[in-house]
Amino acid sequence: MSPVVILLILVGALAHATWNLVVKRSAISGPTFVWLTAVGAGIVLLPIGVVVALLEPPSWPDLALAAAVSAVLHVGYFLALQAGYRAGDVGVVYPLARGTGPLLSVVFAIVLFGERPGPLGLLGAAAVIAGVVVIGLGGGRANWRAARAGVFWGLAIGVVIAAYTLWDAHAVTALAVSPILLNAGTSTMEAVLMTPIAVRRWPTVRGVLRRHWRDVVVVAVLSPLSYILILFAMRLAPVSVVAPAREISVVFVALAGWLLFKEPHPVARLSGAVVVVAGVALLAASR
């Protein structure tokens, strides 16, 4: 990979880890927080998107399709993420969610397309599974009982991550949609989709904004920024290389979960996160 791609991946991973830690802190706010961050991201990205569209007019039907599908998937992702962070530790949910996507891509390739992974692919899949087991069971039975809900949500979120990663990669490559326009359109449609919920809960929305406006701003900026950086990296390097490399963020989050939130079993969870990253890297090397 070129230095530019490496820089894009590292900055994107750090930004992604940061906003997830903020979401964990605000997880009790639920769908209203998700709506507020979508509105905030739209406010930030729409003016930039207008300039990009004027300078390089897109195919509007392709952009509309790409943004609509991505918005549905991302709404599901953010709602599941909120539920996961309410139910479990960030040091469990985040690594499992980020490691499940690449593993599922291998499973889908075997089941749907009849592909047969080589030794590296099988070793990578085994490493991801081993990392999941270490995170869930590393502290013994007591840790498993405490981590069970987080494990469930982490795996469920990973399914959604696999879906939106494949779709968005298709949008910026095959459909040639600008990453900035895709994110601007997606954030706008996310806000539109969730507006009925926000209207029904308007007093709650006002309360969340009053208490968590700083968190809303951080997530509204860093969430699209982290993803835009990765999408640009996907334009410069193969998706099979970029997608696994960005998972270095799981180590950042596992460490932060211990340092910031005093989550238990830091050695087991950090070790499991490192094993997951290694497994994802092996999956990438096998392609």
Question: Model-found features: residue ranges?
Answer:
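Membrane-interface interhelical linkers
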Residues: 1-14, 18-69, 78-90, 137-155, ...
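Structural signature of transmembrane alpha-helices in multi-pass secondary transporters
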Residues: 12, 37, 41, 94-101, ...
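Hydrophobic/small/kink-forming positions within alpha-helical transmembrane segments
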Residues: 13-17, 46, 71-79, 99-107, ...
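Hydrophobic transmembrane alpha-helices of multi-pass small-molecule transport proteins
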Residues: 45, 106-110, 119-139, 268-287
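Specific alpha-helical transmembrane segments that line the substrate/conduction pathway
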Residues: 69-74, 85-133, 181-189, 239-259
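Selected transmembrane alpha-helices and immediately adjacent juxtamembrane segments
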Residues: 147-181
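C-terminal structured domain segments across diverse proteins
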Residues: 216, 236-243, 252, 259-287
